[in-house]
Every structure is written in C-alpha cells, then in structure tokens.
Amino acid sequence: MKKLQLLAPAKVNYRLDVLGKRPDGYHELRMIMQRVDLCDEIEIALSDSPGIRVTCGRKGVPDGPGNIAWRAADALLKLSDKEVGIEITIAKKIPVGAGLGGGSSDAATVLMGVNELLELGLTDERLMEIGVKLGADVPFFVFKKPALAEGIGDRLTALEEVPSLWVVLVNPGIHVSTAWVYQNLRLTTPDPATIIPRSYSSLNEVCELLSNDLEPVTCGRFPLVSELKEVLLTAGARGSLMSGSGSTVFGLFESESAARHAAAEIAKARGWFAAAVRTI
C-alpha cells in the first residue's frame, strides 16, 4: 500500500497578544507566527486492515484517539469511500507541551498527507477549516507561511516580508498546560486597533516586535522560564521570548555560528534541550 514520509515543523511566536475572552470561552488573539526547521518525522501508510493506528513511543504522547494526529486522520477517513486503514508513525523531535506547536503541526501534516494518499483533492482552505476544529494552531501549519494570526488563530494573513533568521530554542523539560495558562491569565486592556506591521526587513525589526501576553503567567509559576531568557541574552541573543504558553524560550541570533555555539554551550552547561534552528 502507498505511504508517505513527511516533516512536521515547529513554530515560534514573535508576538502573542490576548485581546479578550470570547462568548464561546476561547480567547481573541493576535499573533505573529513563524515556522522553524526543528521537525517531527511522520510516516503515513495506507493499510488493508481497517482502523487508524498511531505509534509514537514518546512518554506523554497517546497512541490512540487521544492523539490529535489520530483525530486528523479520522476526520479525513470519514470523507473517503475507500475501505482502508491508516497507520501513522511519529518520531518526535519537538519537545512536548513546550509552546512549539508540535501536536498541531503533526495534525496538519497528517491532514495534508492523508488528503494525498486518499486522493481526496481537498484544498488547503478546506483542510484549514477541518484543522481548526482539531486545534487553533493547526490551520497555520497548513498555511505554510509566516503569518499574522487573528481570531483564535484561524484567521491568517501572510506576512509580506520577513527575514530568514537563526534561532536557538531552549526547553528546560517543564510541561506547561496551555489550558492552565489561559485559565490563570489576567486580561489587560490592549488596544485592538494597534497596527501590527506585515513586513519586517531585519533582525532588529523582529526583535522590536517580541512580546507575549502569556509570559507573565508561565513565569509566575515557573521562574526558570525567566532565567532561560537571561541565559540566551547572555549567550549573545539579540532578543529573547517565551514561545506560545511555554516552557520553551527562543533567542534570535545574528549568524549560524553564533546560534550553534550558544546552543552547544547552553546544552553542555545546563543539560537543557537546546537547538539552533533556521526559520522556514
């Protein structure tokens, strides 16, 4: 039977504004999102045996319907008239519960892969409509471009220009519940009319953008996250920010050599996950 081997990239948020709480319980967001080349490796294969099977082998990542990738495959299998099974194998490279969108990226990659394998012919726009029902970040990974994300993250506008940057990701191994962060968020009164540029020509302009309304909540419970920012800045980052709801913090560097050196030194000195990656 046919199979595909695909990469599911992580993301960072250069900016995350929480504008308010919606009647449906979700929060109104405004984010600048960027993919990076730290990727989970996903194999999707059709099978003669009915059903969906997900194998991951990473502690804390479920193999059955509790896995968002399983639910993505199920959503598309229901649209097909083919009597086949789907086998998904995920090699996790992206830290789990880390604010890097690994689960959402896996789901988006499965949507795109199963769409191809089952020859459904669904457009990216249709896959994004299906994806947002699985998770708010899923449409971004189908979109495949640096984007301004609004609403719950499902209204996407491509950035006109954004520089290719070297980024160091640092994760201390702390699992942060996104739901917990939003439940403990104290809303301020940001101005929804604030203009967020759609074009960034330099590292300096991206650094000026860095802001995350969720950071005080996560740092309040896990002060180590604040320490990570200082560690990155001391290591030469031009700017540093927590990604998503944490606990990963990223630093923006001027060159590949500076990023790789910083990642190696941080991993050696602290024992944390540290990786030099490129924006894509």
From Swiss-Prot:
SUPFAM superfamilies: GHMP Kinase, C-terminal domain (SSF55060), Ribosomal protein S5 domain 2-like (SSF54211). It catalyses: 4-CDP-2-C-methyl-D-erythritol + ATP = 4-CDP-2-C-methyl-D-erythritol 2-phosphate + ADP + H(+). Signal peptide: none annotated. The active site is at residues 11, 137. It is an enzyme of class 2 (transferase). Its EC number is 2.7.1.148. GO terms for biological process: isopentenyl diphosphate biosynthetic process, methylerythritol 4-phosphate pathway; terpenoid biosynthetic process. The lineage of its organism: Bacteria, Pseudomonadati, Thermodesulfobacteriota, Desulfuromonadia, Geobacterales. One of its GO terms (molecular function) is 4-(cytidine 5'-diphospho)-2-C-methyl-D-erythritol kinase activity. Pfam families: GHMP_kinases_C, GHMP_kinases_N. Belongs to the GHMP kinase family. IspE subfamily. Catalyzes the phosphorylation of the position 2 hydroxy group of 4-diphosphocytidyl-2C-methyl-D-erythritol. This is 4-diphosphocytidyl-2-C-methyl-D-erythritol kinase. The keyword Membrane does not apply. ATP binds at residues 95-105. Pathway: Isoprenoid biosynthesis; isopentenyl diphosphate biosynthesis via DXP pathway; isopentenyl diphosphate from 1-deoxy-D-xylulose 5-phosphate: step 3/6.
